Design a protein with these regions (language model features):
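Core alpha/beta nucleotide-donor-binding catalytic domains of modification enzymes
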Residues: 2-157, 167-171, 176
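Short, hydrophobic/aliphatic alpha-helical segments
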Residues: 2-5, 189, 381-385
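A structural signal for well-ordered alpha-helical segments within the folded catalytic domains
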Residues: 18, 39, 43, 143, ...
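Class I S-adenosyl-L-methionine
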Residues: 105-112, 125-323
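Short, small-residue-rich loop/turn micro-motifs
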Residues: 122-126, 220, 349, 379-380
């Protein structure tokens, strides 16, 4: 592009806990506004917004004191930051009814300036393979959220947009949904493309997780761009040795949301990725409690995993089987691969930890909030507001930060 700029601005729609946004901020982009309907996720973004402002103004100690405090008064933390920044995190569902008000808040924040980029993707449950079986897609309003996304494109006319979603969006209604989205976007004046292999995988961006996502990138027709080629990162890092080893071993139900010291020195992976980023303590290393029945199953699952097999729920001793419909629970219990990368972390982690069993048999538990956040490549000073369950849900729904940063760097080159 002909105009050289130092900073590019973006709006993050359906922002969740801010994983995508964090990656773009790391790549030098400036957020104008975040829009998210979940209150806990909004509070998380407000706290992260405070972190970035305090860091830029050399006042990180205020943020660190907040992390260390046992009472955590987030409103007090936010008071240290210009009010308009906190107000730029808009806690609203995006709908026909709320659009005028959302636009008004963003316009005030923009103060006549342009928006260079819109990022974000509507909640993925609607397009996910699982979600589809449950509901008649036509009547689910979430399937029409892309129309509101297009309204933001029409109003703010950014140079580019990045639309993130689950692989299920490709096959939803035999591809009809995707073509509807493409058509609407083209009518708004944009060229649009998906990756040559249909999706990108987080593990190619240095994330220790096998997570496929469809990243749709669009640009104004006159810009004459094409879908970028992403560099993939080859590495042999492993979950247990490189991602979890410095955290204190915990048993079922142990841990705290508050600050605790690291148990061991950092690792090369944690340094390279800036996950463990300079603090001498970590928060939210807390595990949910499970009953004895589940814990016995965890032990069996880990033994089988170590022998190269996955646990089949139906083959457990009868006394341990609590669900009559064993077919739908075949893969209910899954161990995180300690000697490789994790399987995909999803929001269901908030319901129970059975799908994310810690690979160390001695600890016999599901993974902690902080371990889940690390699998999603969130830095250790990223604090998730709300309850333990709320934190798990935010993490499961997020875009991994390292993946977001890799995408953001390419988008910046294109701009």
């Amino acid at each position: 592009m002909d105009k050289k700029k130092d900073t590019f601005t973006f709006i993050d729609l359906f922002a969740g806990a801010g994983g995508l946004s964090e990656g773009f901020i790391r790549a030098g982009f400036n957020p104008v506004a975040h829009v998210e309907m979940n209150k806990d996720a909004c509070d998380t973004i407000k706290t992260r917004t405070a972190y970035h402002w305090l860091k830029d103004n050399k006042k990180t100690s205020i943020y660190n004191d907040y992390l260390k405090s046992e009472t955590k008064n987030k409103e007090e933390l936010w008071k240290n930051v210009p009010e308009h920044l906190i107000n730029s995190v808009i806690n609203k569902e995006i709908s026909e009814k709320t659009l005028p008000e959302i636009f008004k808040t963003i316009d005030k924040e923009l103060n006549g300036n342009e928006v260079d980029l819109i990022i974000g993707g509507p909640p993925c449950q609607a397009y996910s393979i699982v979600g589809r079986a449950r509901k008649d897609m036509e009547s689910d309003p979430r399937n029409h959220l892309y129309k509101h996304y297009v309204k933001f494109l029409e109003k703010y006319k950014p140079m580019m947009f990045v639309f993130e979603n689950v692989p299920g969006i490709l096959s939803a209604k035999n591809g009809e949904y995707l073509s509807k989205i493409f058509k609407a976007v083209k009518n708004a004046g944009y060229e649009v493309s998906i990756p040559p292999k249909n999706h990108l995988n987080a593990k190619d961006f240095g994330v220790l997780q096998d997570r496929k996502r469809v990243i749709i990138i669009g640009w104004k027709k006159e810009l004459n761009l094409k879908y970028p080629e992403f560099d993939t990162s080859e590495h042999n890092f492993q979950i247990l040795k490189d991602l979890f080893s410095d955290l204190k071993p915990l048993k079922n139900g142990q841990g705290t949301l508050n600050a605790v010291e690291y148990a061991k020195p950092t690792t090369e992976y944690l340094k390279q990725t800036n996950i463990r980023n300079g603090l001498d303590f970590v928060t939210q290393h807390i595990v949910r409690p499970n009953n004895d029945n589940d814990l016995e199953i965890y032990q069996i699952a880990i033994d089988q995993w170590n022998n190269g097999k996955r646990l089949n729920y139906a083959e457990l001793p009868k006394r341990l089987i609590k669900h009559s419909n064993t077919d739908s629970f075949v893969n209910r219990f899954q161990v995180v691969n300690g000697k490789g990368v994790s399987h995909t972390v999803v929001a269901h982690i908030a319901m129970d930890g059975h799908y994310y069993i810690h690979p160390d048999k001695k600890q016999n538990r599901s993974i902690s909030v902080r371990e889940a956040a690390r699998i999603q490549s969130f830095p250790d000073d990223y604090f998730f507001e709300g309850s333990r369950t709320a934190a798990f849900k935010q993490i499961g729904n997020a875009v991994p930060v390292l993946m977001a940063e890799g995408i953001a760097k390419k988008v910046r080159e294109m701009l």
